[in-house]
Amino acid sequence: MQSKRYLVLEDGSFYEGYRLGSDNLTVGEIVFNTAMTGYQETISDPSYTGQIITFTYPLIGNYGINRDDFESLVPTLNGIVVKEASAHPSNFRQQKTLHDVLELHQIPGIAGVDTRSITRKIRQHGVLKAGFTDRKEDIDQLVKHLQQVELPKNEVEIVSTKTPYVSTGKDLSVVLVDFGKKQNIVRELNVRGCNVTVVPYTTTAEEILAMAPDGVMLSNGPGNPEVVECAIPMIQGILGKIPFFGICLGHQLFALSQGASSFKMKFGHRGANHPVKNLETGKVDITSQNHGYAIDIDSLKSTDLEVTHLALNDGTVEGLKHKTLPAFSVQYHPEANPGPSDSNYLFDDFVAMMTNFKEKERHINA
């Protein structure tokens, strides 16, 4: 017989289901993800640090978990919520079940609940604090705890690498500032021949410039960009000296460094089916996204940044470029794994930018 578990929200509502994953019951910000596949990549995405993910697709875990598709070594989310968790997955690459991996990494979950109802609540009221309990009589106490608890402010500190390391390539050298990077960013750069040095988020502009890279990339990561104050002088110190590409949190920090401001979204963008329009080409890409903050478009008017991409669902800023310097960014994930791959060309654009900049520097110094 399956053990009961309850998902409790800070507004006092609760949902009865059954135990999935660990008994290490946690609290966190509850969000929803609309992707139909890629649950392994989702639960191992560091951008979900401290959050509880509600999967809107009704069946999760049906192709198991394998060792190759993780986006980080250790998942850092605080829980998952599913309608149905497959107990008997089937795939030739499968090595563990979803339940096994959640238990291994001390991540609790709940299955057998109405995920549509939970998603509607989040859409109507915004993201909420939530937690798990296995005892119905503890629900009232948990509600009080959720209403009072302060969630961590700087999740980047949890997931950023503590020491630099290198993923070897043969051509251009890239410094990747790790705010909670997904492994597929490194893969996409390596595939294009880039030698990637991953550095902590506290690395200074002087330390980066001393490495003499051909380009700098700011990774994705969790939480509020305004908390990551140390990144602002770093970005300002490298801008114009070497080509620059920011993704997700890196995009937001790029904008903040130039005088723009950010805001917390009601329920964010999380999924693999978000349409984004490229304003320069008119093309629409289907993108993978995972962010709860966005850049205020009006705050860009007094900056040297130009909007290059917009979300078609709500009109929020999805891409920027500097008007005169070799620097650009996108709010979404061009490295999306398992997909979509509509925006992979942005890595090619970055490589071309580095190559052209290097050639110009060579002519200037000749």
Swiss-Prot record:
Residues 1-171 are annotated as: CPSase. PROSITE patterns: GATASE_TYPE_1. The keyword Ligase applies. The active site is at 248 (nucleophile), 333, 335. InterPro entries: Anth_synth/Amidotransfase (IPR050472), CarbamoylP_synth_ssu (IPR006274), CarbamoylP_synth_ssu_N (IPR002474), CarbP_synth_ssu_N_sf (IPR036480), Class_I_gatase-like (IPR029062), CPSase_GATase1 (IPR035686), GATASE (IPR017926). It comes from the Bacteria. Pathway: Amino-acid biosynthesis; L-arginine biosynthesis; carbamoyl phosphate from bicarbonate: step 1/1; Pyrimidine metabolism; UMP biosynthesis via de novo pathway; (S)-dihydroorotate from bicarbonate: step 1/3. NCBIfam families: CPSaseIIsmall, PRK12838.1. PANTHER family: CARBAMOYL-PHOSPHATE SYNTHASE SMALL CHAIN, MULTIFUNCTIONAL TRYPTOPHAN BIOSYNTHESIS PROTEIN-RELATED. This is Carbamoyl phosphate synthase small chain. It comes from Staphylococcus aureus (strain Mu50 / ATCC 700699). The gene is carA.
